[in-house]
Amino acid sequence: MKVWMAILISILCWQSSVWAVCPAWSPARAQEEISRLQQQIKQWDDDYWKEGKSEVEDGVYDQLSARLTQWQRCFVSEPRDVMMPPLNGAVMHPVAHTGVRKMADKNALSLWMRERSDLWVQPKVDGVAVTLVYRDGKLNKAISRGNGLKGEDWTQKVSLISAVLQTVSGPLANSTLQGEIFLQREGHIQQQMGGINARAKVAGLMMRQGNSDTLNSLAVFVWAWPDGPQLMTDRLKELATAGFTLTQRYTRAVKNADEVARVRNEWWKAKLPFVTDGVVVRGAKEPESRHWLPGQAEWLVAWKYQPVAQVAEVKAIQFAVGKSGKISVVASLAPVMLDDKKVQRVNIGSVRRWQEWDIAPGDQILVSLAGQGIPRIDDVVWRGAERTKPTPPENRFNPLTCYFASDVCQEQFISRLVWLGSKQVLGLDGIGEAGWRALHQTHRFEHIFSWLLLTPEQLQNTPGIAKSKSAQLWHQFNLARNQPFTRWVMAMGIPLTRAALNASDERSWSQLLFSTEQFWQQLPGTGSGRARQVIEWKENAQIKKLGSWLAAQQITGFEP
């Protein structure tokens, strides 16, 4: 009873999650969006199954297909299966291909495994499914998966694949096998190399004419022997004896989801002879083959690897002004998981870069993780039917603006606060952008150093600042008063690197103000252009006013 209740809760949670991400579209727009994506996927299917070519990465195709199904669940009572390949398959399978249900995560897999025994895990080899029919010891027929009931006659093509056994004996002499035609790889590490569009490459080789030599780059992984020996060990032994050795080598007994997870992680990082996109867990006990039907296999499930790149919906386009006044564009996303990291925002770059990408809310973009786990945009894979892009702010900001607060300076002013609080400047631990926004909103700073005047009571009564952290924050602000002079100058945004500033040996504000352009130009990494920027900076009225204010606060190096 508890198990069924857990399953029911899981289903309800799944349904809730589906409806929670339904787009806020009118019926007319929903129909248009669904129709457009449906037509595109149909075109990809036609290219894939009729001509053996792919205009889209396998992972992108899978995720956009899932997105279409999600939209259909939101707006159509009965989602239609857009992928019914091949369109002209006419050969009946002796045993139907059931397909495999995907598990969302380890918990879902654990629930499924709980009521089952004699379970085995295999790699989910990434290729094209096939039926192999042996009669009287010879390969009699090879049929593409098609729609699960009918497929293409691939006998002639498969007979040219040297890795596929053309003759067998013993129990296999009159058998029907199901498996995956795959692209042979030498030491393929899925974690490092990804999917390499293997499925599309296999389909292309099988569909094209006159490519008999290249077919030898293919092989087959047998994953099912309908009506075969009852014991999995006997099944594996007979297949290996016949020459289908991969099945025995890559099939392991498992008792629980933890064991599956260990094997899954092992194969994710190991050198394998094929591309994989997850694992399949199957029960050794199967119904008679006459009961097999597409979409109705209860004895096996798949747990796919998390894609290296995820398709994410753009929810909003936002503009940020950095401390130097440059405007950057950020895409706010419907959350996706990448390598155990929840990604909700991705930096697009400059306004010009955003315009080149042509990204609007409602578009679907491909996101991956670059170095140090930073999200990046790889591609725009689908653009919505209705596209409204926001207008970027006027480019009125520069490195000498917004040291003092104003309505138009909000974003650059906050960026300056975030910068001066960073480890490499004043090292104000425990406060980031959200904290600075809370302080400024409550206490209405006049300039970027106004926080020095805050009292413990003011900090404690600031909404958004935890009372338990307010004393620590006040302590950090007080410690900042003792930071070296060069750190304060960096906080003021002097256009020099730390190395150049240290080499200048400037130790007071008055000394810095009297230094000439020639003096700055001789510093390491500082040319004439940078030297002129320093002169413009120190002669700026806002900078002079800040210097006088810091002198009044008796900050080291600024005293008269």
Swiss-Prot record:
Disulfide bonds: none annotated. Pfam families: DNA_ligase_aden, DNA_ligase_OB. InterPro entries: DNA_ligase_AS, DNA_ligase_B, DNA_ligase_CS, DNAligase_adenylation, DNAligase_N, NA-bd_OB-fold, NAD_dep_DNA_ligaseB, NAD_DNA_ligase_OB. The active site is at K124 (n6-amp-lysine intermediate). PROSITE patterns: DNA_LIGASE_N1, DNA_LIGASE_N2. GO terms for biological process: DNA repair; DNA replication. One of its GO terms (molecular function) is DNA ligase (NAD+) activity. Its EC number is 6.5.1.2. It is an enzyme of class 6 (ligase). HAMAP family: DNA_ligase_B (MF_01587). Catalyzes the formation of phosphodiester linkages between 5'-phosphoryl and 3'-hydroxyl groups in double-stranded DNA using NAD as a coenzyme and as the energy source for the reaction. Belongs to the NAD-dependent DNA ligase family. LigB subfamily. This is DNA ligase B. It comes from Shigella flexneri.
